[in-house]
Amino acid sequence: MISKIFEIVHKHQKFISGVCISKTHTKTAMCQVKRLYFDKGKYSALNYKTTKYMIHDPNDICAVGDQVHFRECAPVSKRKAHVVEKIVKKNPITEFLRQNPQYIVTPKEIAERKENDKIKYKHITDL
């Protein structure tokens, strides 16, 4: 009953749609929102403005590349005042890697490959 009342009260809150660009902290995601605007400058062109939001992700369901809907809420921290509502579209690369873990490459493997790919120069006297 109380949840229905809260749904009615918060119905006026608009959702913001964006893409998750960073997930370095627990329960926090950085989302980027692109907005189209008309630039009335010399050439009168349509341009995009991007805004970054730190959003609260209480269940840690976001991943980098996901399209999410989020809304305003009471401030959770100094820079976080938005909360995730739902994930609209999952990142297809993340889903593929989750289903096929054999393709995941660790930073240690990358460093080893770089070391093996280096050209090993020898002095002429060593030949």
From Swiss-Prot:
Gene3D superfamilies tied to this protein: Nucleic acid-binding proteins
Any one GO molecular function term: rRNA binding
Pfam family, one: Ribosomal_S17
Keywords assigned by UniProt, alphabetized: Mitochondrion, Ribonucleoprotein, Ribosomal protein, RNA-binding, rRNA-binding, Transit peptide
Keyword set includes Ribosomal protein: yes
InterPro entries with a match to the protein in the record: NA-bd_OB-fold, Ribosomal_uS17
Compartments in which it is found: Mitochondrion
Family recorded in the similarity comment: Belongs to the universal ribosomal protein uS17 family.
Protein name: Small ribosomal subunit protein uS17m
Lineage, highest ranks first: Eukaryota, Amoebozoa, Evosea, Eumycetozoa, Dictyostelia
